[in-house]
Amino acid sequence: MSSSEEVSWITWFCGLRGNEFFCEVDEEYIQDRFNLTGLNEQVPKYRQALDMILDLEPDDIEDNATNTDLVEQAAEMLYGLIHARYILTNRGISQMVEKWRDHDFGVCPRVYCENQPMLPIGLSDVPGEAMVKLYCPRCNDVFVPRSSRHQHTDGSYFGTGFPHMLFFVHPDLRPRRPVTQFVPKLYGFKIHPVAYGGQEGNSGGNTANNVAAAQNNTTPAGQQSGGQFNNYGL
């Protein structure tokens, strides 16, 4: 950041490789102390970290590398926790919607979701418990970010409720559930769920016996099956 005095700390931080999921929190939001309630108890060196985020000169300058590193780590944590609150506001949601539409968070790897854009989500609101995941609003599942540079971002910096708040505010943006579902088949026939039930806890020999029994129970040629499933569930 020292190479350009005109770039704010927030812009610099969000521009770092691996921080592409973050949006830039408005400084006015950060300057409102009500929005920061309780964070001073969660973040070490809170005052110095806040001054760094807002590009303010610290009251007491400790010129040593160790202290600077600690303040930078605290600033990252503080900004992340502020960010989790900010993206639940109308302004924050609008910024994240733009990033979502630009596919900044990637698309769902599930084939039948047809490249549905995903949203970042935390599995915990407590810092240090879980890394950020990606939520697909179409199949309603979560995935590990594809790029390794995003796999070390704390999930609490996005929170557990962000995607759901976005769709409460913009219900028109919620995609429809996939029309097509994958259907497992064997030799062209659909596999009935019952076919897997008898295999649990059986050894290879028992499985072979089950197959033999199933073959003996199949309908002889020339007779009507009456629409019943055989032991394979086909």
From Swiss-Prot:
Its main location: other. It comes from Caenorhabditis elegans. Expressed in a subset of the adult male sensory neurons: CEM head neurons, ray RnB neurons, and hook HOB tail neurons. SUPFAM superfamilies: Casein kinase II beta subunit. GO terms for biological process: response to hermaphrodite contact; vulval location; Wnt signaling pathway. GO terms for cellular component: axon; cilium; cytoplasm; dendrite; neuronal cell body; non-motile cilium; nucleus; perikaryon. It holds the Pfam family CK_II_beta. Gene3D superfamilies: 2.20.25.20, protein kinase ck2 holoenzyme, chain C, domain 1 (1.10.1820.10). Participates in Wnt signaling. Plays a complex role in regulating the basal catalytic activity of the alpha subunit. Modulates two aspects of male mating behavior; response to hermaphrodite contact and vulval location, acting in the same pathway as lov-1 and pkd-2. PROSITE patterns: CK2_BETA. Tetramer of two alpha and two beta subunits. Interacts (via C-terminus) with lov-1 (via PLAT domain). Belongs to the casein kinase 2 subunit beta family. GO terms for molecular function: protein kinase regulator activity. PANTHER family: CASEIN KINASE II SUBUNIT BETA. Keywords: Behavior, Cell projection, Cilium, Phosphoprotein, Wnt signaling pathway. This is Casein kinase II subunit beta. SMART domains: CK_II_beta (SM01085). It is found in: Cell projection, Axon; Cell projection, Cilium; Cell projection, Dendrite; Perikaryon. The modification Phosphoserine is found at residue 2. Phosphorylated by alpha subunit.
